[in-house]
């Protein structure tokens, strides 16, 4: 009967420590011992770890202290405390079962030793199997953490985003799962659900490893790998010197000095004003009106004289962008220009299949593909009405979630982790169905996916390590999120729960600088979230 019970535990219990504790109790009772323990070898630090214990441990611990010296010794049947080796299939020692008894005839017989060794032998394969499973899980988790760290390290400006979002998301899910009343009383995460969500939270931005960093960090409109405002300023410097030269030439041909210098100074002032205007537009801090864009175009019509070949010293890729013959030098160039070489078209080697009607769209994406892969035209970029991103830039950034889903669906997830691709990639969907990459409706999104969306937004608003924006205080962040609830972007019910539970404060005390932690008018935030969007 004892053997049957032990076999049932070995087959049914997935957790190694729980399994060993149950088996040890049955083991000790079956051989009528007083106490016992199971020690397993830890190769990473060459030590012995007690994984299970039953009864008094004084004598057991004394024997355990000598485990490193008894590997090849046979159990002494006259000892009151005996260690039985658990050997793997290749003969190496996985651990020991240590049993303490009274030393009576029953426990000093050869039959006791043989029976105990056989029972111990039953543990080897289940232990090896569970250790293999746990090592594979540890390896998978390590890969995931390494990938998240690589993304954060790749950009000094995203800092710990891939680490902070999982912390907040798990904080919220655990709190929801503990609810016994209210709207989330029926929400429960078992161990498998929790593991899937935790790993998904770590992987939620894994596609960013494919996103050009200069686009993620694009802090000004003219920024590519560097801020091209410096090129524009150099052209203004050329015109500035041209004005000085024109002044001197005018005087040589008889124009009065005062008149020539007045004309020069007027040009100086206009150039200074025009450059300051362009520089301000480059920041992207305010909405551009039609009048502002018209002035940009007018300034861009001015010309400067280029004397040097602009196709010297180029890479093969740069050369491939020129599809027309080089004009003879010197050549008049516009002060601001959208040149053909500023445009990179989609090609057969790289053309994301994200449009709904695309027959090669295998993942249900529903996104609009911009006409070009890249467009760094100067007027085109400076004319961005709000922010610093063109439609091409925005797609390149949003494409990270497309790549996340493609990457994660290629992995052979075990059954209990098969929700990870959806959990990880739906945090950019919206409650009104206007999100991306698949325009999911609210009814298609689980509570966990809504939690990750909320955590991602709150972390982004409060993060102090982004070059393209200043960090918001907690009160500012929550009010912005309340307005996002009005717009059916975030889940209103979940957001109100988040605010009223003050989970944001628990997170803030761990991850947000003190100067950003201000007073929050919870009632005002909740009222704003509940209000209908105008």
What annotation goes with each model-predicted range?
Residues 1-18, 29, 50-51, 135-146, ...:
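Signal-transmission linkers at sensory-effector interfaces
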Residues 1-2, 106-128, 138, 195, ...:
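Amphipathic alpha-helical "output/dimerization" segments
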Residues 94-117, 127-130, 389-391, 468-471, ...:
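Regulatory loop-to-helix N-cap segments in sensory/regulatory domains
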